[in-house]
């Protein structure tokens, strides 16, 4: 049985980062809503309480009874989690005189405390809170302070319960990983035995037990997630897996043909379906982004339903859903941020059970699994691409001509990123493509005046988008070389009929999302 850390999510934007940091310690963890602790799970070895956008004294704040957890498992509260435990045990939490956001340094701390083992003196930590603990209960002790925060960290005396008002999961906390290692490995006893290989071994065994001799259909998109899911399932159930790759007409240039070839080389049983005319017809005149996503999602259901009925006795629908898909589709408060193609809707109409073997993995973990499975590097390192394809990179309504323009521009941009060689941090040669997390071109709903030769033009503008990230939860715009952008801009304007202006998007996430729609 795989031991795990449970992270109780109180709605923090950095909850996913906590999970990533724990998994980087080769220890498995799961995030569950703050009020859904799995009390009957014998594999739990420790609990982390996340931050929250609420104040602990707000009537609407998320609150939970920890009496059945405390004393049974080691607990680490982060930010709100720390404030919540202090407040509910009789401590005081009040609005800070000055809001604490950004860098701070540990001015005093108990170096003998197991949570702070090997944490350096004056180590930088990252603060992000508007409230602060002003008094702790009698059975609590302060174990760290900063210049402005007297109670930066505490421990409940004689208990394996700690709280920190800073964020060890954030990169800017210099010894944050060490602190988390102290908790996960030394205090909770984590064996650090979770890896891509162990995930494959466990998941294949679970899939065999779950699926038995049932037949499964899986929707391939050409992306990393569905491809790795397919190879993993193929390893578990072989010929009982049938993959369906639908061309909705909004794939990248030549993608349908190239991806089908890749899948055949992997030994997958794949059916390719050209449904482009159906999608173009149903999307005609539709401009609103969410409507476009819904139409494409429904279109996939229709095509899948038709193809699945041609296969006898199919019982399961498999998808390449990963963690960020689930988090962006539904927040802890139930507010829809953006509908994801992979989340919701499909199994209900098709009357199939749902299988999502990668649902609890982050993107980089999916790639590690793909490498462990022996998949070719060009498939594993492909940039993320939205399920609705170029439809959400065309602002406004969709037409075959707009798709043609965007395909041509995108092909020039992506190939340019692949061809432009640079040195990585270790001095090894790589390409710009492998230095960015995701890139693409957006066709803007505007036209602008230009001059080509001696003639005035009035043609479309496109925006280039490239971001750096590790998990898609946050992202920064990529600082591409000016020489590269000048070349790509020139190539697009000269080679793509209908475009006379190229812009570059320098928005980070948040506040923007990676995709424009």
Curated annotation (Swiss-Prot):
The lineage of its organism: Bacteria, Pseudomonadati, Bacteroidota, Bacteroidia, Bacteroidales. GO terms for cellular component: cytosol. The active site is at 79 (nucleophile), 167, 169. This is GMP synthase [glutamine-hydrolyzing]. Residues 194-382 form the GMPS ATP-PPase domain. It comes from Phocaeicola vulgatus (strain ATCC 8482 / DSM 1447 / JCM 5826 / CCUG 4940 / NBRC 14291 / NCTC 11154). ATP binds at residues 221-227. Residues 4-193 form the Glutamine amidotransferase type-1 domain. Its EC number is 6.3.5.2. The gene is guaA. GO terms for molecular function: ATP binding; GMP synthase activity. It comes from the Bacteria. Homodimer. Gene3D superfamilies: 3.30.300.10, 3.40.50.880, HUPs. Keywords: ATP-binding, Glutamine amidotransferase, GMP biosynthesis, Ligase, Nucleotide-binding, Purine biosynthesis. Catalyzes the synthesis of GMP from XMP. The keyword ATP-binding applies. Pathway: Purine metabolism; GMP biosynthesis; GMP from XMP (L-Gln route): step 1/1. Pfam families: GATase, GMP_synt_C, NAD_synthase.
């Amino acid at each position: 049985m795989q031991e795990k850390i449970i992270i109780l999510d109180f709605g923090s934007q950095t909850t996913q980062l906590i999970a990533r940091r724990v998994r980087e310690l080769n220890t498995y963890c799961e995030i569950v809503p703050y009020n859904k602790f799995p009390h009957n799970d014998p594999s739990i070895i420790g609990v982390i309480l996340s931050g929250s956008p609420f104040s602990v004294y707000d009537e609407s704040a998320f609150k939970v009874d920890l009496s059945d957890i405390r004393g049974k498992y080691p607990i680490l509260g982060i930010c709100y989690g720390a404030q919540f435990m202090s407040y509910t045990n009789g401590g005081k939490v009040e609005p800070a005189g000055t809001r604490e956001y950004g860098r701070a340094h540990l001015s005093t701390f108990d170096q003998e405390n197991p949570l702070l083992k090997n944490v350096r003196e004056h180590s930088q930590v990252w603060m992000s809170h508007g409230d602060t603990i002003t008094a702790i209960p009698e059975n609590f002790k302060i174990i760290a302070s900063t210049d402005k925060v007297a109670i930066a960290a505490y421990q409940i005396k004689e208990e394996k319960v700690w709280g920190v008002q800073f964020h060890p999961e954030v990169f800017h906390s210099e010894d944050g990983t060490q602190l988390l290692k102290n908790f996960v490995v030394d205090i909770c006893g984590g064996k650090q035995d979770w890896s891509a290989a162990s995930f494959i071994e466990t998941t294949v065994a679970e899939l065999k037990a779950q699926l038995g001799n049932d037949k499964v259909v899986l929707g391939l998109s050409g992306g990393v997630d569905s491809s790795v899911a397919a190879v993993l399932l193929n390893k578990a159930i072989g010929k009982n897996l049938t993959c369906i790759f639908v061309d909705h007409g909004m794939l990248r240039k030549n993608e349908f043909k190239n991806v089908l070839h890749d899948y055949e080389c992997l030994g997958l049983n794949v059916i390719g379906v050209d449904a482009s005319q159906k999608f173009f017809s149903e999307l005609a005149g539709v401009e609103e982004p969410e409507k476009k996503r819904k139409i494409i999602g429904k279109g996939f259901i229709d095509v899948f339903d038709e193809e699945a009925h041609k296969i006898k006795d199919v019982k399961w629908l498999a998808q390449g859903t990963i963690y960020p898909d689930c988090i962006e589709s539904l927040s802890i408060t139930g507010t829809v941020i953006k509908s994801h193609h992979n989340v919701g809707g499909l199994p209900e109409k098709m009357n199939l059970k749902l299988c999502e073997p990668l649902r609890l993995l982050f993107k980089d973990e999916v790639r590690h699994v793909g490498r462990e499975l022996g998949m070719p590097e060009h498939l594993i390192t492909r940039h993320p691409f939205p399920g609705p394809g170029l439809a959400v990179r065309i602002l406004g309504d969709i037409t075959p001509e707009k798709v043609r323009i965007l395909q041509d521009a995108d092909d020039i941009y992506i190939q340019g990123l692949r061809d432009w060689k640079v040195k990585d941090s270790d001095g090894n040669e790589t390409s710009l493509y492998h230095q960015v997390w995701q890139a693409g071109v957006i066709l803007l709903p505007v036209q602008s005046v230009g001059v080509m030769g001696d003639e005035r033009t009035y043609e479309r503008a496109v925006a280039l988008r490239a971001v750096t990230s590790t998990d898609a939860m946050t992202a920064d715009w990529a600082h591409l070389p000016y020489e590269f952008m000048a070349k790509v801009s020139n190539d697009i304007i000269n080679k793509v009929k209908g475009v006379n202006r190229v812009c570059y998007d320098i928005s980070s996430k948040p506040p923007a999302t990676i995709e424009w729609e």
